[in-house]
């Protein structure tokens, strides 16, 4: 544990680095100790120590910028009015050649303190896979309510992607354990919802609730497609999650379609 009253010059660089490695920028900031650490490092004029100080300052700046970005997303949701419960809903899987379309609805506590913001939420496609996995669990743990809905490839073929998209939006919202006063949907108004609904273009980059829904839906569907990859190994589902990559199309042409392919999406390929 670093003692800020200790003479830093009595420590080797390796000792300093080891101690700092144990620290969290987030905890330092929340405990108001980041300034103490930077001032302590500044007392040492060794170049490697000063470089370490600069790195910590950059990490702190990145963290504060992220807090600011996510605060703006929470404020965006609150800007619609004094609704008690706001749900964000998003889908994943409109475009793939195989597998279902999945939607998730999420109600967040939009009045949390800064320390309880869910940082790094964004359009799920902009978040790296390992981070999405981590965030999905955090969102499910912290959400006041969330619900996932699925429409199969067969239903997509029978009734069309627009019907399936609306169905999963509607089902995920109507199945929430808390009835929302407002639903923010990504890109589309939801037909027959019976709850006040506003669509937000590129909502997963603007709205905290929609971004959270985007991540949970993406992680759920990706896991599902990776399970399907074990049953249908010829299409590279573990990597393309059903989208029409060259390997996927190559598999289709060589082995034909599987039970989870969308026939209506394959008319120009087979």
Swiss-Prot record:
Record has RNA-binding as a keyword: no
MF (Gene Ontology): manganese ion binding; RNA binding; RNA-DNA hybrid ribonuclease activity
Domain RNase H type-2: from-to ranges: 84-270
Substrates-to-products reaction catalysed: Endonucleolytic cleavage to 5'-phosphomonoester
Binding site for a divalent metal cation: 90-91, 186
Keyword rRNA-binding: no
Cofactor remark: Manganese or magnesium. Binds 1 divalent metal ion per monomer in the absence of substrate. May bind a second metal ion after substrate binding.
Keyword annotations of the record: Cytoplasm, Endonuclease, Hydrolase, Manganese, Metal-binding, Nuclease
Cofactors required: Mn(2+); Mg(2+)
Residues passing through the membrane, by range: none
Name of the protein this chain belongs to: Ribonuclease HII
């Amino acid at each position: 544990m670093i003692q800020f009253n200790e003479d830093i010059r009595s420590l080797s660089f390796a000792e300093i680095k080891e101690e700092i490695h144990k620290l969290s920028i987030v905890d330092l900031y929340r405990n108001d100790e980041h300034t103490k650490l930077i001032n302590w490092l500044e007392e040492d004029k060794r170049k490697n120590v000063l470089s370490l100080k600069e790195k910590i300052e950059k990490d702190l700046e990145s963290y504060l910028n992220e807090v600011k970005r996510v605060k703006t997303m929470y404020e965006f949701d609150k800007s619609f009015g004094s609704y008690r419960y706001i749900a964000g809903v998003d889908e994943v899987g409109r475009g793939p050649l195989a597998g279902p379309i999945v939607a998730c609805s999420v109600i967040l506590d939009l009045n949390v303190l800064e320390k309880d913001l869910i940082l790094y939420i964004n359009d799920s496609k902009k978040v790296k896979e390992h981070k999405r996995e981590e965030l999905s669990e955090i969102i499910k743990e912290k959400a006041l309510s969330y619900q996932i809905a699925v429409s199969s490839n067969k239903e997509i073929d029978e009734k069309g992607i627009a019907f399936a998209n609306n169905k999963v939006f509607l089902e995920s919202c109507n199945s929430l354990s808390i009835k929302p006063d407002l639903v923010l949907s990504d890109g589309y108004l939801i037909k027959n919802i019976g709850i006040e609904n506003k669509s937000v273009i590129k909502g997963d980059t603007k709205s905290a609730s929609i971004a959270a829904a985007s991540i949970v839906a993406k992680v759920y569907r990706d896991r599902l497609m990776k399970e399907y990859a074990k049953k249908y190994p010829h299409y590279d589902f573990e990597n393309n999650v059903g989208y029409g990559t060259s390997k996927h199309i190559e598999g289709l042409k060589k082995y034909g379609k599987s039970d989870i392919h969308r026939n209506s999406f394959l008319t120009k390929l087979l």
